[in-house]
Swiss-Prot record:
It catalyses: tRNA(Ile) + L-isoleucine + ATP = L-isoleucyl-tRNA(Ile) + AMP + diphosphate. This is Isoleucine--tRNA ligase. It is found in: Cytoplasm. Keywords: Aminoacyl-tRNA synthetase, ATP-binding, Cytoplasm, Ligase, Metal-binding, Nucleotide-binding, Protein biosynthesis, Zinc. PANTHER family: ISOLEUCINE--TRNA LIGASE, MITOCHONDRIAL, SOLEUCYL-TRNA SYNTHETASE. One of its GO terms (molecular function) is aminoacyl-tRNA deacylase activity. NCBIfam families: ileS. A motif ('HIGH' region) lies at residues 58-68. Belongs to the class-I aminoacyl-tRNA synthetase family. IleS type 1 subfamily. It comes from Buchnera aphidicola subsp. Cinara cedri (strain Cc). It is an enzyme of class 6 (ligase). ATP binds at residue 608. A motif ('KMSKS' region) lies at residues 605-609. The keyword DNA damage does not apply.
């Protein structure tokens, strides 16, 4: 009597169905640490092909958020892929440690306690180290393989000295200057801001149309009126429009476009000048229905005419500027060189300079109009309206909601404010034209990044690099007390400072005096107390790779890749590009990838106010880092990325699909020893040869998608391979021989050999993304020589590559197309409850001669392809009326009959009664032969 269960090779494995990632991942991290994985990956690899990804430094403040996780995971996927492709790809994580946010946190902690600057910097430094350690541990928990023992902080002495060394090169080129210019200014920061430190949000403002009365002069008389009429001149006003009424006291000119046409319009007894295209729009707003056009003229004709300020006792000129548009307002713009960059440029041509009547806190300081003194510019705009009404200079006003710049840290409105600052000149020596040409040669992903960078650089003013703060890298300049000029030996002095800072840090600058560095005429110079823009620091850090990796070709070092969020076009990408082009005349990167922002399920940005933040730490604790990594890879990260608990659950389903496939593969090779049981390729069944060739094909496509950084397509291919090629096809077709044939039969060992190879492929495919799961798989694989999956490369078996199956992919594609068509008919019969299982079927095929001969090749194995108990082939012409015609295959009809034969309790096939042994546990002759290894050998499957 045969024990049926014991006679079957039922699948079993130690590889768990439940991943328990949150626990298992920590074990794997300990293993990586124990074997010193990062060092092992890079030991003796410097002669390999090289790939350098430059880390955009996150800010050393607070817990990592989901955006940090996206960024670091993407970088990690790329670097793991590159290392598995044979590249030397080191990764040194960087951190930005200076800047306002840290200063403000320390100021809040200190409250009103006063300490000196030296102590303040020490406290900032201690805080930074704690933050970096916290973030570092969070990044390690994500599975990021990096040189965690050699991280790069902007506070490192080498970084401080390198930043000043780069600045010295720019000074040497004569591109640094000091000027009184309008820059972004935050009242709370009490400092200038970089463009990358502002964000635009909607703000309610008062928009006003103001009358600036023209002063009678000969230009008007000679140009426009033959008959001089003093009454008309006394009543002509030029209308200006502004959304910043607080700037009216600082107005020093009115700009019009020299090439556009303006009109003098009569309304009742008054005359107004405004641009031709906007006349109707302006008067409609003020509900004016009747007006008369007196004359038209080009803007250039009234240059230098003067107007009265609407309430200050001053006269202001009309000037020309091409930036004035006919799309908005009146075509006349009041010019405040203190509070607008375009205003400053236009006024500079007429030698009109800023007057600085708004202080650093936002209060007016006007000698000529004391009513506004000590009033904050944002709090008393209504006061300006009142004054204008009182002086009968307000033509019209309304409240509008418009996009306005805000401080990214304080979330409060900022202004342009003229202050003495240090700038890098970006206008000299065709700098922008040369940079445009280099931008074209860089690979931008997405491609729109190229035009975005070009547009931003085109309109970018000179770079303000000075900040009026404490916590930062110093601007080590000495300026003349009277002239404000840099010391003539500045470059030489800075080179000395660089050497000292490399050994002692920048404290040596802060704690020194003028005499330390200048011996002659030291009493006529003073130290600059400003610090450098943090974007200059991070922009200069690409040159540190040279020192960290001992790169031989130092002069021409270029990073292969920069990868950051899309906001970094105006931030780190731009600062790095400018610095590299100035100092080395080459871009710092060959490729730039940007990822989108993380949104919630409703498409809203993550924010504290909306309470929609999802912490990466909580996701890891609940689901594991591999789920988070899979979510990052699964989405097209070049767009904004959505996350929610529902989305993560869908990602978990996809993870289970991959894991269950791998578990099933393991369960079918539980008794397989590669060194004993492996079957040579040429002796394997043709179906097994097919799946190996198919797997190789998938690997080529997957590697290509990895190399194109299209990870969502990598994942889709892996899932497709697991679900379709394996789940719906190969693994279904081999079940019979896997379970029912003798455990040492060539048929079974052949499919086990194929499964063994598939696992070798699959574990490598998922490794860059599902790093912990891949390591878990690797630990259970036989014949592994390396301690970690990441110490291997893409699977290449010479025996498999050289050999080609007699029955190639095209051959099997044809048979699987037929199988797919037949399955449609079988599924219909299942739905109709005619059958429960396809093995109940006798399949009758009525087919054309060509197809008949093709299927005849399979002989008795045909039923195993269609997973039925019996298959019969007939000529197409003999098809009965009940046979159903295929819609996809020509001359192809199918008839399905339910078998009346007996079901074998072991293999579940239906066979004739006389094919069974007459005993209590009757099993079919096929099963007996399989057990005794006397069966006819399979060729195909």
């Amino acid at each position: 009597m045969i024990n049926i269960k014991k006679s079957l090779n039922l699948p079993k494995t130690k590889f768990p169905m439940k991943a328990n990632l949150a626990y298992k991942e920590n074990e794997i991290l300990e293993t990586w640490k124990k074997i010193n994985l990062y060092n092992k990956l890079h030991k003796n690899k410097k002669k390999n092909k090289q790939f350098f990804l430059q880390d955009g430094p996150p800010y050393a403040n607070g817990n990592i958020h989901i955006g940090h996780a996206v960024n670091k995971i993407l970088k990690d996927i790329i670097l793991k892929f590159k290392r598995m492709s044979g590249f030397f790809s080191p990764y040194i994580p960087c951190w930005d440690c200076h800047g306002l946010p840290i200063e403000h946190i320390i100021e809040k902690k200190l409250s009103k306690k006063k300490i000196n600057k030296k102590e303040f910097r020490k406290i900032c430094f201690k805080y930074v180290l704690k933050q970096v350690e916290k973030q570092k541990n969070d990044f390690i928990r994500l599975g990021i393989i990096a040189n965690w023992d050699n991280i790069n902080l902007s506070t490192d002495y080498i970084n401080q000295s390198n930043t000043i060394k780069v600045l010295t090169k720019i000074v040497e080129k004569g591109l640094i200057y000091r000027d009184l210019k309008p820059v972004y200014w935050c009242f709370d920061c009490q400092s200038a801001l970089a463009e990358a430190e502002i964000e635009y949000k909607f703000k309610k403002s008062i928009s006003i149309y103001i009358e600036y009365k023209l002063i009678e002069n000969s230009i008007l008389k000679n140009n426009f009126f033959k008959n001089y009429n003093k009454k008309i001149f006394n009543n002509i006003s030029i209308l200006i429009f502004t959304t910043t009424p607080w700037t009216i006291p600082t107005c020093q000119a009115i700009a019009i476009n020299p090439k556009l046409y303006y009109q003098i319009i009569k309304i009742n007894k008054k005359y107004y000048i405004c641009i031709e295209e906007l006349t109707k729009k302006i008067f409609k707003k003020n509900n004016i229905k009747k007006w008369k056009i007196i004359l038209s003229f080009k803007g250039k004709e009234i240059e230098h005419i003067k107007c009265f300020h609407p309430f200050l006792n001053t006269q202001i000129p009309i000037i020309l500027s091409k930036h004035v548009s006919n799309q908005l307002g009146t075509g006349a713009v009041h010019m405040s060189p203190d509070h607008g960059y375009e205003d400053f440029i236009a006024c500079k041509k007429y030698k009109i300079i800023p007057k600085q009547i708004v202080d650093s806190h936002g209060f007016y300081k006007i000698k000529k109009y004391s009513q506004l003194n000590n009033i904050h510019i944002f709090n008393k705009e209504n006061k300006i309206i009142y004054i204008l009404k009182k002086n009968k200079k307000l033509f019209f006003f309304q409240t509008i909601n418009h996009n306005y710049p805000h401080c990214w840290r304080h979330k409060k409105p900022i202004i342009f404010r003229a202050t003495p600052q240090w700038f890098i000149n970006l206008s000299k020596k065709n700098f922008k034209e040369d940079t445009f040409n280099k931008i074209k040669k860089i690979l931008w992903i997405p491609s729109w990044g190229k035009n975005k960078m070009k547009k931003m650089l085109k309109i970018r003013p000179d770079w303000c690099i000075s900040r009026q703060r404490i916590w930062g890298i110093p601007l080590p300049f000495f300026i003349h007390k009277n002239t404000g000029e840099l010391h003539p030996n500045t470059v030489m002095i800075m080179k000395k400072i660089v050497k000292k800072i490399r050994n002692h840090g920048y404290k040596i600058w802060w704690e020194s005096n003028v005499n330390t560095w200048i011996k002659k005429d030291s009493e006529t110079y003073r130290k600059v107390n400003d610090v450098l823009d943090v974007w200059f620091e991070s922009g200069a850090n690409h040159q540190l790779k040279i020192y960290k990796h001992n790169i031989k070709n130092k002069k021409n070092y270029v990073a292969d890749l920069y990868l950051e969020g899309s906001d970094q076009h105006r931030g780190w990408f731009m600062s790095s590009l400018i610095i590299s082009m100035i100092t080395k005349t080459i871009p710092p990167y060959l490729s730039v990838i940007t990822h989108g922002f993380v949104l919630d399920k409703n498409g809203q940005k993550m924010s504290k106010s909306l309470n929609n933040n999802i912490s990466p730490k909580k996701i890891i604790q609940k689901k594991g880092a591999d789920i988070l990594r899979l979510w990052v890879a699964y989405t097209n990260y070049t767009n904004d990325i959505s996350i929610s608990n529902e989305i993560l659950e869908q990602i978990s389903d996809n993870y289970r699909r991959i894991r269950n496939t791998i578990r099933f593969l393991f369960s079918n090779i539980f008794d397989f020893k590669a060194n004993i049981h492996i079957i040579k390729y040429e002796k394997m069944l043709f179906l097994d040869q097919w799946i190996i060739e198919k797997t190789y094909n998938y690997q080529r496509k997957i590697i290509k998608k990895y190399s194109q950084y299209q990870f969502h397509k990598v994942i889709k291919k892996i899932i497709n391979f697991c679900s379709i090629e394996l789940g719906s096809c190969y693994l279904e077709l081999i079940k019979d021989r896997q379970y029912t044939m003798h455990k040492n039969s060539i048929e079974r060992r052949s499919s086990q050999t194929a499964i063994f190879y598939i696992l070798q492929f699959l574990v490598r495919w998922i490794a860059p993304i599902l790093s912990f799961t891949a390591e878990e798989i690797w630990s259970q694989l036989q014949e592994k020589k390396e301690k970690s999956i990441f110490m291997t490369q893409w699977y290449k078996n010479k025996q498999l590559i050289k050999k080609k199956s007699t029955y190639n992919l095209f051959f099997w594609k044809k048979i699987f197309a037929i199988r797919k068509e037949i399955n449609l008919f079988i599924e219909t019969e299942k739905k109709n409850k005619f059958i429960k299982n396809s093995l109940e079927i006798i399949l009758l095929l009525y087919i054309n001669k060509k197809l008949f001969n093709f299927l005849l090749l399979f002989n008795n194995e045909l039923k195993f392809i269609f997973l039925v108990s019996e298959t019969q082939l007939h000529k197409y012409s003999s098809a009965p009326s009940l046979a159903i015609k295929s819609k996809k295959i020509k001359k192809f009809k199918i008839l399905i009959k339910k078998s009346k034969k007996i079901k074998c309790p072991r293999c579940w096939n239906y066979t004739k009664k006389n094919n069974f042994l007459k005993n209590k546990n009757s099993i079919c002759n096929k099963c007996i032969k399989n057990i005794n290894q006397t069966n006819k050998k399979h060729i195909f499957l």
